[in-house]
Amino acid sequence: MGAMEDQLQRLGSVLDSLDARVKKLEQHPTLGGGSSTAQEIRMILIGPPGAGKGTQAPKIKEKFSCCHLATGDMLRSQVAKKTPLGREAKKIMDQGGLVSDDIVIGMIKEELDTNVECKGGFILDGFPRTVPQAQSLDAMLQARNQKLQHAVELQIDDALLVARITGRLVHPASGRSYHTTFNPPKKAMTDDVTGEPLIQRSDDNADALKKRLATYHSQTAPVVDYYRKTGIWKPIDASQEPGTVWKSLLNIFDGDAKKASSAGGGILDKLAASGR
């Protein structure tokens, strides 16, 4: 009888131990590997200036509790903090040169390693702009046992972009963007969230925009083709209302890319009504 009780006690201890391990794994699903949770997002947002990246990225960030990595903001932040990469980048920029791909990849990696927000994933905005950059990004992520899930392209006609950008308003601190016609703030020239003043960028004029668009199209076509071949490229009609574009993004995240790419023309009606 005593031997039977001992066996039952040992069996109970084993079951308790297994139960504890199961609970621990449920609490930490990524233990023992680099795989992500179901809610983690890893994506790049492709689109010309004025396509709506600054409108949609904060919504994605809020939904997934992830970080929004805009290369320009990253560079300015690293330079301001005088990090080793920031000092190296500043030296190059002061000499009128272009910051190397290795430095930008290094900055992205540092953000992924140290930015708490990046634990929920990331949105890359403004990078990669070339196929070699895309390949370097893939290699860096592969070394972390990660890979991109989505390369979303916000597609829009150049003529509509001119109308959009010449009325664009920006909140400098957050990057939130508005438009006098398409997406006006609740109070004129005032950020909805902070109440701080909005600005209009000096390069948001038709002539400057045409040059930026020419550069964008020549650079981006090969990158889009690269991600199309990998199977993660998804197009969205960015001429639609911001709310409709957001629904298209949600469809992509839910796996319905066909529905996400459907056309809509609500924004064109606003354009005509505004007399632009």
Swiss-Prot record:
GO cellular component: cytosol; mitochondrial intermembrane space
Highest taxon listed in the record's lineage: Eukaryota
Location in or out of the cell: Cytoplasm, Cytosol; Mitochondrion intermembrane space
Recorded GO MF terms: adenylate kinase activity; AMP binding; ATP binding; DNA replication origin binding
A Pfam family: ADK_lid
Keywords: ATP-binding, Cytoplasm, Kinase, Mitochondrion, Nucleotide-binding, Transferase
Homology family: Belongs to the adenylate kinase family. AK2 subfamily.
Entry protein name: Adenylate kinase
The organism of origin for this protein: Pyricularia oryzae (strain 70-15 / ATCC MYA-4617 / FGSC 8958) (Rice blast fungus)
Gene name of the encoded protein: ADK1
